[in-house]
Amino acid sequence: MKQKVVVVTGASSGFGKGAARRFAKAGTRLVLAARRENLLHELADECNATGGRAIAVPTDVSKIREVQALAQKAVNEFGRIDIWVNDAGVGALGMFDQVPLADHIQVIETNLLGTIYGSYFALTEFRARESGVLINIASALGKIPAPYYASYAASKYGVVGLGAAIRQELRENKITGIHVCTVMPMAMDTPFFDHAANYTGHETAPIPPLYDPQRVVNMIVELAIDPIDEVIVGAAGKVASVAHQFAPGAIESFMARQTQKSQIERAPVAPFFAGALHEPIAAGAEVRGGRRSE
């Protein structure tokens, strides 16, 4: 890993921040991207002090020109891109027709189009050298949907399909040096719920069980070294994914009931919340969200 050039989007918190720290300790050269510029610069300083060499590039991945500029900055600064991690993501929770359409659009533009943009510019660079690892962060909801997450699930289904289609293209054209990995985490204790827009009328709560996000952080670094096509992180997700192949109706009904209980029936009433969909907010600046009891 030493001296590899790694681009990480969504680096101001959650999986992206954790992965950046791990990559820095491995001696990589990092290009850190997110909307929160102050947090990016703080993280870059931290990474520079722990063995890596990092630069901060404030980026809104829903804007194609900013993602293109991010890729160009990486090449200009370090000469190439070896690994690209598409982690930036947002969510909007609520009954589909009660969430503002502008919020659904923003979820798709950030989660799906942002991943498409990053994948496109990363692969353009990889193809020039016939080498590279693309790691896209999807979700277990990209395999099994849940109520109140309609646009989020749609975006993550799209990310899963994107990775599968690109891998087919690479295989059919016998391009063996480029790898596309899709990570599908179960509910993880990240700041996701600090940032997600919430129109359920209840306090946000993850669908249990809730896992330590360090599992995903570790998986990202492992995939950069030893790529595999798809991986679900969280034992419950692995079991549910297999069961869904044989009894999709039963598993989707179970997921719906679990979501209804955890996020509506057992959750205190709360006002609507716009979250960080359209503008970044200060809350949720670490890898963990603090909702999981150790």
What residue ranges belong to the model's regions?
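SDR active-site lid
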Residues: 172-267
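Residue(s) in the substrate-gating loop at a strand-loop-helix junction
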Residues: 139
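Conserved glycine-rich Rossmann-like NAD(P)H-binding loop of the short-chain dehydrogenase/reductase
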Residues: 28-43
